[in-house]
Amino acid sequence: MEGIILKGIGGFYYVKTEERVYECKARGKFRNKKLTPMVGDRVIITPNDNNYGAIEEICTRDNYLIRPQVANISQAFIVFALKNPDVNLDLLNKFLIQCELKNIKSIVCFNKIDLYGDYENHEAVKMVSDAGYDYIFLKAKEETNLDELKSKLKGNINVFCGPSGVGKSTILNKLVGKEVMETGIISERLKRGKHTTRHSELVEVNNGFVVDTPGFSTLDLKFDSKEELKDYFREFYEYKDQCKFNGCLHHKEPKCGVKDAVNNEEINKDRYEFYVKTLEEIIQGGRNKW
């Protein structure tokens, strides 16, 4: 029987199948393979009586996060406030690249729109739009456009990420309920209080799942080579065939289709300048971690 792990704690994993949620233990073979089940894992279980079972197989993961430990994230909502705090464009780009690196669809949430007058013309909105990413305007405390956000959850395992103070917790509270955020769905069954250590879990919302703790707590990005970086800037794709050199880094090479597109305002200048700065950091540092 196939299911998805909603929560794991103390060696017990709570697996949702089409029928119900089973409390499962993992077979010893996983310990021998040094493989630990994670929230979000698709698994094969053998159910026993009284809603208990055993995890027999962990299906191949599409991706996984270290903090929080969650597998198979399919969509990330990158939350930034337009004011208090102001948008850090470099940090926003780092979140976008992190998602590209892990093959996670990105949707940018611009929160606190009431604090910024002409919010639709904010430079961050223009940059995200020019790069071809979806975005939503929010006033989370008053639930403005929250229904639009909810409609995008369906069929996905969703994580919310972004810097401190932008309203991630407010959004999560509105989506999954403050009580769930504080104690967790299954915590009540385990008689665990709200002041014990938090473990991430999946909460079902609008036929999708939401990770109940913010994701991407670290942004250490590792690349196999400096040539890899350009692959995570989606707006470069349609211009790379116009470059003279096959291995063009879109940096100092002559006759570069990407640089021409920047000069013609077909590629956002802020995005390109961030790319160049990051590429130079990788090259000058003699490393592929940034």
From Swiss-Prot:
Gene3D superfamilies documented for this protein: Nucleic acid-binding proteins (2.40.50.140), P-loop containing nucleotide triphosphate hydrolases (3.40.50.300), Probable gtpase engc, domain 3 (1.10.40.50)
Binding site for Zn(2+): C243, C248, H250, C256
Subcellular location: Cytoplasm
GO biological process terms on file: ribosomal small subunit biogenesis
Gene Ontology terms: cellular component: cytoplasm
Ranges where the CP-type G domain occurs: 62-219
Record-listed GTP binding positions: N111, K112, I113, D114, G162, P163, S164, G165, V166, G167, K168, S169, T170
Keyword vocabulary terms for this entry: Cytoplasm, GTP-binding, Hydrolase, Metal-binding, Nucleotide-binding, Ribosome biogenesis, RNA-binding, rRNA-binding, Zinc
Cofactors required: Zn(2+)
Domain of life: Bacteria
Stored PROSITE patterns: ENGC_GTPASE (PS50936), G_CP (PS51721)
Main location: cytoplasm
Record flagged with keyword Zinc: yes
Annotated EC: 3.6.1.-
Cofactor note: Binds 1 zinc ion per subunit.
GO MF annotations, alphabetized: GTP binding; GTPase activity; metal ion binding; rRNA binding
Function of the molecule: One of several proteins that assist in the late maturation steps of the functional core of the 30S ribosomal subunit. Helps release RbfA from mature subunits. May play a role in the assembly of ribosomal proteins into the subunit. Circularly permuted GTPase that catalyzes slow GTP hydrolysis, GTPase activity is stimulated by the 30S ribosomal subunit.
NCBIfam families hit by this protein: ribosome small subunit-dependent GTPase A
Subunit structure: Monomer. Associates with 30S ribosomal subunit, binds 16S rRNA.
Similarity remark: Belongs to the TRAFAC class YlqF/YawG GTPase family. RsgA subfamily.
Name of the protein described by the UniProt record: Small ribosomal subunit biogenesis GTPase RsgA
Organism: Clostridium novyi (strain NT)
